[in-house]
Amino acid sequence: IELRVDANGAFSPKDALEKLKRLSEYQLHSIEQPIRAGQWEEMAKLCECSPFPIALDEELIGINNREEEIKLLETIHPQYIILKPSLHGGIGGSEEWIELAAERGIGSWVTSALESNIGLNAIAQWTATLIPTLPQGLGTGMLFTDNIDYPLHIEGDCLWYDPNVQEPDILNWIKQ
């Protein structure tokens, strides 16, 4: 089993490296956003010294022009970035981040931002076109109690789209 953890920016820059060293005992794949976003120099130092990979998540939110994206990636140089298309300019904005990261040897994966199954379906189908090699974070649709049924289902550790299942009548569902 490969585990990723998310600190959601909870560590202080002062004690983050010590916490990362302690967490490294668990042979984690990576940690997301160990310190609060906006601390580029401190995050860069962590990415350089961390005993295991760091993935940026919240750090990317609100950075929507190519020059700033390049500046962030070259300043911090994380091992991974995590893309939520709904928060990064849609599919086009996410593809730009992926391209810029790949040019710099930085990996990536896609997650959802708690979209309904309609949005999750679109993100999942786009993500499949990327031919990902890492597990993606798209299994969130089952968290909702009032979500439109869609031909998506989890089987094992994969999210599947079943083309034999008829897609729902969205307008009818909205009227309910």
Language model features: what each stretch is:
Residues A113-Q176:
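Flexible C-terminal active-site loop/helix
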Residues I1-N121, Q125, F144-E155:
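Catalytic core of soluble alpha/beta enzymes
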